[in-house]
Amino acid sequence: MYSLARPFLFAFDAERAHALALRAIDTAYRTGTTALVATRPVPLPTPAFGLMFPNPVGLGAGLDKNGEHIDALLALGFGFVEIGTVTPKPQEGNPKPRMFRLPEYQAVINRMGFNNLGVDVLVKNVQRARRRGGLLGINIGKNKDTPNEEATSDYRYCMERVYPLADYITVNISSPNTAGLRELQEEQALRRLIADLRETQEALAAQHGKRVPMLVKVAPDLNDRDIDAAARVLADLAVDGVIATNTTVTRTLVASHPMAEQAGGLSGAPLLGQSTLVLRRLRARLPESIPLIGVGGITSGADAVAKMAAGASLVQCYSGLVYRGPRLIGECVDAIRRRRESPSGGAVGPL
């Protein structure tokens, strides 16, 4: 079905095509025809962060920034859906055009800039959702006009608002499209921010009588020293999990493409190698008590298995869906199932 729709969608610019695809998914959900678009995978229960996921394949943040499509997306067969990135105040993001396809590479470049309607709107949307069939992550960020020195207040505000509704919360400090945001990954800044948010998390757990896991999403462009420093901080502060990785600012593998010079984060197939290297190094540096979600470059079941082999407990797709459609979800679940049932049991490979 998606193979028939893709030429139509690709006739539009990438951001417009995303909106049309979401509208189609919503229509299928409302009319009970989602089965024509995607086949729900056989459950593959997977534990992580103290939660039980129906299957280990999720949707990465960015597609549903305001939580407007949660039920329709879960109906496609995802084990979990991550919405956002959401900020305290609404913001328009960067000027359009700000999303570009590189079909020859199964890649996307975006410089969206945390465009969203604000956390209060997202909360209302989540409250309306039925949330059947999977878990919900909420990805939080800071407004672009909030200086890094005051970033903690933005993250804290968002965490307080979404805490009662989220199955897990992701702290996004790694988007390349908000000026200066990645500076929060530097060791001392990271330690200050995460220490404060861990205190907030524990206070909210006491207030609400439940503990919602807090994850941190990191960039693929960290060098080995930066990865080791980040791992040290995240282990010291006992975060619940890490998502590896966000998009990359490097263009080495797509340098010949006419869109390669567009500013923004590159995602899709060219990101697979670098994001998986970061994932593998983090797995070697972090205690087993901190699970990892592998994201970046998954366009096949084999790619999902590569993430699991590098140490991921769960995986997420996004750009791969642009090129493969919803069938990618079931393909990834089935590939991970075969790996799990293999005699080796899926041990992590060497660094």
UniProtKB/Swiss-Prot annotation:
Cofactor binding note: Binds 1 FMN per subunit.
GO molecular function term, any single one: dihydroorotate dehydrogenase (quinone) activity
Cross-referenced Pfam families: DHO_dh
UniProt entry tagged with the keyword Membrane: yes
Residues noted as binding FMN in the record, renumbered to the chain: 61-65, 85, 139, 172, 217, 245, 268, 297, 318-319
Enzyme class: oxidoreductase
Residues given in the record as substrate binding sites: 65, 110-114, 172, 177, 246-247
Reaction equation(s) it catalyzes: (S)-dihydroorotate + a quinone = orotate + a quinol
One record GO biological process: 'de novo' UMP biosynthetic process
Cofactor dependence: FMN
Pathway linked to the protein: Pyrimidine metabolism; UMP biosynthesis via de novo pathway; orotate from (S)-dihydroorotate (quinone route): step 1/1
InterPro entries: Aldolase_TIM, DHO_dehydrogenase, Dihydroorotate_DH_1_2, Dihydroorotate_DH_2, Dihydroorotate_DH_cat, Dihydroorotate_DH_CS
Active site (UniProt): 175 (nucleophile)
Documented EC number(s): 1.3.5.2
Gene3D superfamilies: Aldolase class I
Protein family: Belongs to the dihydroorotate dehydrogenase family. Type 2 subfamily.
Description of how the protein assembles with itself and partners: Monomer.
Job of this protein: Catalyzes the conversion of dihydroorotate to orotate with quinone as electron acceptor.
Protein name (Swiss-Prot/TrEMBL): Dihydroorotate dehydrogenase (quinone)
